[in-house]
Amino acid sequence: VLTDTKYIVQDDLEFSPFGVFDEFFIKYIYYNNGMKEIDKIINCIYNDDPYNFKLFTDLLMKYNRMLNVKNRNQKIVLKNALMRIFFDRFYILHPDIINENNSNSYNFGNTCNSLRWSTPKAIDINPNLMKPEYMDKPFISIVHSSEVLQEASKELQMLEFFTNPIDIFIHTFSALKVVDNFVKASTFEKRVGKFITMFDKSLIISEKAQMSFDDIFLLFCLIFTVYPPSNSKKLSTFLSKMSGISFEPPLEYAKLFLVSTI
């Protein structure tokens, strides 16, 4: 199936979306009684602090050998499929790893509510990154009036529905790219004014925006507060305690942004 199936792979991120092989692989694991081994590994990891996922990496290498996987893209598909199966099972056995209790969720929600009703001017957002008419508007209103920022907000809102880090980091990374494009469009429009409609969107996106880490981090934080995942604090704690699994630099970058934001 891995050889014959057509699949999508983002090589630079070592990511492949859920597909036919994922469906086949979970059946393969159950058929070969592989879930018992997964359960044993999960319970070992759960009782460790911080969570060391080296045993998951060893399991992945075992399946690479069993299935004789040598092609890089096939290895990526296998890693993503096993990660989804493994972390879904982890959540079934130990839902407390990412389930938020009401008191933590309530306090975090209040903080987010305060921030999303703040204005860019009130929290010292760099005026070069925003249209002048946005500076005195509550940030929640800015997001609702911008299709681009709504897209980023939706990517982040979806995080609470995932149990595995690869999909969490991919959606976070997608939101970061949207924020970057928003800033590029805003700074480009400031330079060309009403002539913005004369330029192709791809040209605007290719523009190099002069944006510091602090600038993009603050914008990302504010977008996150509009519709934050209900299990944000638990999610952050779990991701912070993970070790033993490697991700490509862009996804490690996304992890850093997400955990730091929460």
Language-model features, listed with the residues they occupy:
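Intrinsically disordered, low-complexity regulatory segments in eukaryotic proteins
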Residues: 1-206
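Alpha-helical bundle/repeat cores within regulatory domains of eukaryotic proteins
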Residues: 154, 166-262
